[in-house]
Swiss-Prot record:
HAMAP family for this protein: UPF0745 (MF_01866)
Protein name: YcgL domain-containing protein Tcr_0238
Annotated stretches, region: Disordered: 78-97
Domain of life: Bacteria
Domain called YcgL: residue spans: 3-87
Matching InterPro entries: YcgL-like_sf, YcgL_dom
Length: 97
């Protein structure tokens, strides 16, 4: 069964996202969480299903968090994760062939 979800991005930190059930909106979130997150900027509403592909997290993990906590916060990728998309340094290129 699909769950209609709203996604928000943080105005304070790049690549920090908050997912909440659309029917609840942001009203049920604590003031502390919203202060830490910063001004939420609405990105998209979508149906969350088990088969839904999300960028950096498993849909089932998001669904469980929404059911238990009422929200899911997707943290920015770590510096190591970001480096995974970078080409190897030039000194390592001689080993390619």
């Amino acid at each position: 069964m699909a769950l209609l979800v709203s996604a928000y991005k943080s105005a304070k930190k790049d690549e920090l996202y908050l997912f909440v059930p659309k029917e609840d909106g942001l009203e049920k979130l604590s003031d502390e969480l919203l202060v830490m997150f910063g001004e939420p900027q609405h990105v998209i509403d979508f149906d969350l299903t088990e088969k839904r592909k999300l960028a950096r997290v498993d849909a089932e993990e998001v669904k469980k968090a929404l059911e238990t906590k009422g929200y899911f916060m997707q943290m920015p990728p770590s510096e190591i994760e970001k480096m995974g998309d970078m080409p190897p340094p030039p000194e390592h290129l001689d080993n390619i062939f």
